[in-house]
Amino acid sequence: MIQDKSKGAKQTLLERPWFLAVALAGLIGGAMLITSFIRATDNTLSLCSTAKNTAASIAKYTATPIQLQSIVHYATSHTVPQQSFEEISISLNVLKERLPCNFLVFGLGRDSLMWASLNPGGTTVFLEEDPEWIEAVLKDAPSLRAHHVQYRTHLSEAGRLLSTYKNEPMCLPAKAFPIRYNEKCPLALTSLPDEFYDTEWDLIMVDAPKGYFPEAPGRMAAIFSSAIMARNRKGDGTTHVFLHDVNRKVENAFANEFLCEKYKVNSVGRLWHFEIPNAANMTDQPGDRFC
């Protein structure tokens, strides 16, 4: 998220702070206008009919309050998301196919208003470990649904956790669920709000917690718990998991261990996109390993 910035190259969007406002405005009216125009012919009656249909379509469409707030926010701010346009587009394409959906985002930032506005009618929830940061973000975007999270891990423990988790039976995929009560596995997120456990998430974005200094929580538990929730999905379809900052060693290693290379369907910049089936559809997968 915005708060957890890497020291890499500057994002191209930083030079175009007006870009998201234009894009969001286009989402509201552009698709309907284009659809109407491509059907128009030189026939006068057809043109009149098309104009009437276009006006009716626009009149019927009502932007949600959070979409309108998002347009104004990004049109009047120099703050843009940390992710590049290409990275955002990967998630946006899935959102367009699945919305309205249940969208869980690890991390809260100046881009959170954008993510919520891209899921109109759906449920978008943000998890953040810094209570002061939550207060700062919600001051400008009070409509966001954000929860404070306390993690049990530290980035300095990543190597040990990765090499020893198999020694704890409750960390294995066959026994790790439900993670709400799984105190024996240090990678399980056990102290989250009820909404986290009671909702079946269609999309999960892991772009937090902090993971760039030893005392930080790291994203180990977020990645592990995302994999467990995806494997235990009860509804139809797969769970889409997006992991940002895969250029970092811990994110890369834990993604390969728990999200699995064979489920990776897209990769651009520092973002990996996984499409994970539930355990019932993993006919070739034993219960003692993830990949």
Curated annotation (Swiss-Prot):
NCBIfam families from the UniProt entry: A_thal_3515 (TIGR01627)
Cross-referenced Gene3D superfamilies: Vaccinia Virus protein VP39
Keyword Aminoacyl-tRNA synthetase carried by entry: no
A Gene Ontology BP annotation from the UniProt entry: plant-type cell wall modification
Domain of life: Eukaryota
Entry keyword set: Golgi apparatus, Membrane, Methyltransferase, Transferase, Transmembrane, Transmembrane helix
Entries under Pfam families matching the protein: IRX15_IRX15L_GXM (PF21729)
Designated name of the protein: Arabinogalactan O-methyltransferase 2
PANTHER family: OS11G0490100 PROTEIN
Major subcellular location class: Golgi
EC number(s) per entry: 2.1.1.-
Subcellular location: Golgi apparatus membrane
Outcome of gene disruption: The double mutant agm1 and agm2 results in the absence of methylation on arabinogalactan glucoronic acid side chains.
Organism, scientific name: Arabidopsis thaliana (Mouse-ear cress)
Gene: AGM2
